[in-house]
Structures are given as C-alpha cells and as structure tokens.
C-alpha cells in the first residue's frame, strides 16, 4: 500500500491510500510514523498507525478538555466516553496523562480545598461530597480536610448570612437561620454553634417591635379570612412563635389587638 495523499484538516490530517482506505490522524501520528506522500506501508504498519491515531486523538481531546481548568480523572474519563473514544483506549490515555502530570487527583483535592479557603464558603462535609461526585476517593480527601482550619471560612459565611437577615428576623430566628445556613454549607453543628455564639446578635427593642408589627399585620391578613376570635388568636400566636418571636412579646401584641 502507498500513501497517495496527506491533506490537512484544521488540527488533523486526512491520509488517503492508493487502495481507497483513508484515516484521520493527529500531527503526533504523522511525526511518530514519519508519514509522507508516496510512502509505502504494509498491513501491519497500517494497523499500528490506526491504533496510535485513535490513542493520540483521544489524548488530544483530553488535553483540550483540561487545558484551561483542572479536572479529576473521572471527569476526563466521562468526557472521553461522551466523545465516543473507545473504552478500551481510555485506560492507556489516562495513564499517559497521569505520567505527564496532566491529571492528578491528589493535586486536584489540594487545589480545590485551598481555593475554598481563599474565596469559598463551603464546609468539610459539602467539600467532600462535591469531590466524591467528581470521582475522587475519600482517602485522598479526608486527610486534606482534617488539616484545614474551617473556622475562619465559617465565620465569613455566618457574617454574610447575618448581613442578609439582620433587619428581617428577630434574634432567635436569626440565630436559627445562621446555624441552618452553615449546616447547609457543610459545617458541623458544633462549629456552627460556636461561630454563632461569637456573633453579636442583640437587637434593640424598637427594631424587634417593628419586625413583630410587620409580621403580625401580614399574618392577620392571611388568617382573618378563615378564623376569628380565640381560634384566630391561637393561629397568630403559633405562627409568630414559629418565626422566632419571644412568647411574652407575642402575648403583649395579641392582648393589645384583641
């Protein structure tokens, strides 16, 4: 067999043989086999070229995927499968990428956790969950999390929640909101409690009264359509208490109204 034509197609090359066969290959394939027009090749060489061309194409796709963003091994594997790279070739592609330090799950974990410490707001439980979803083994994750101090991250996250709700909720509800927010972000309950205890959540009585008045008026409009008298009073009390208002303040408000 003889190569009758080599035609460049963007980042790839189309090789045509004089027997009608053709194959799209990467530049690495051209270089590795020193392919050129009029070159004579036998059937075994052609099979070797096809095999390496598939490997090289898959590796090229993977390198493009990780060029601008660090990826885990599983992310690269999934990407290659999605782009119809043969499952038989993927292990050798992954091995080549690992040898070249293009993918390194331990380094991925280190970078991910460090970046969260600098600019993120996630706790260890959520970080572990997200990393495991990327296919990273827990034994690579847990030692890094154990060595990381999450108190300052939790502090910043708590302050952000506080700033958002300080003018909307009474102290008890605000405390619950911050703790629940920290739990949702993957921090432990003990750390969340400790962080909240360090915050100054005291509110002046006038502010609490204003919040109670606003909430009372809103709930009154809601429940007065269906209830009246004692039943309405009970519904209002229960709803206001669930929202974190002090029992004595609620009772005073209800007595003033009824």
From Swiss-Prot:
UniProt record, GO biological process: regulation of DNA repair
State if Chaperone is listed as a keyword: no
Q: Which GO terms describe its cellular component?
A: cytoplasm
Primary location class: cytoplasm
Tell me yes or no: is Cytoplasm among this UniProt entry's keywords. Answer: yes
Please give the coiled-coil regions recorded for this protein: none
Q: Which organism is it from?
A: Streptococcus equi subsp. zooepidemicus (strain MGCS10565)
One family from Pfam that matches here is RecX_HTH3
Q: Which gene encodes it?
A: recX
Question: PANTHER family in the record, alphabetically?
Answer: REGULATORY PROTEIN RECX FAMILY PROTEIN
The entry sums up its family as follows:
Belongs to the RecX family.
> Which terms are listed as keywords in the entry?
Cytoplasm
Compartmental location: Cytoplasm
This one is known as: Regulatory protein RecX
What biological function has been recorded for the protein in this entry? Answer: Modulates RecA activity.
């Amino acid at each position: 067999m003889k190569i009758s034509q080599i035609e460049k197609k963007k980042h790839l090359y189309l090789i045509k043989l004089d027997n009608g066969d053709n194959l799209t290959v990467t530049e690495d394939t051209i270089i590795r086999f020193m392919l050129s027009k009029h070159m004579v090749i036998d059937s075994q060489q052609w099979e070797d070229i096809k095999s390496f061309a598939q490997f090289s194409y898959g590796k090229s796709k993977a390198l493009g995927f990780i060029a601008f963003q660090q990826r885990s091994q599983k992310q690269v594997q999934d990407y290659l499968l999605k782009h119809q790279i043969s499952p038989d070739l993927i292990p050798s592609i992954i091995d080549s990428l690992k040898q070249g330090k293009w993918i390194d799950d331990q380094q991925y974990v280190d970078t991910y956790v460090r970046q969260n410490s600098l600019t993120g707001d996630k706790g260890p439980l959520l970080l572990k969950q997200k990393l495991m979803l990327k296919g990273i083994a827990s034994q690579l994750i847990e030692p890094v999390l154990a060595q990381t101090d999450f108190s300052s991250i939790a502090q910043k996250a708590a302050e952000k929640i506080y700033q958002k709700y300080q003018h909307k909720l009474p102290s008890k509800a605000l405390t619950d909101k911050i703790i629940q927010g920290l739990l949702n972000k993957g921090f432990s309950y003990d750390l969340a409690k400790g962080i909240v205890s360090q915050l100054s959540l005291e509110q002046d009585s006038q502010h609490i009264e204003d919040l109670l008045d606003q909430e009372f008026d809103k709930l009154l409009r809601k429940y007065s359509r269906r209830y009246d008298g004692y039943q309405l009073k009970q519904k209002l009390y229960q709803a206001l208490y669930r929202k974190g208002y002090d029992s004595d303040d609620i009772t005073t408000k209800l007595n003033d109204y009824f």
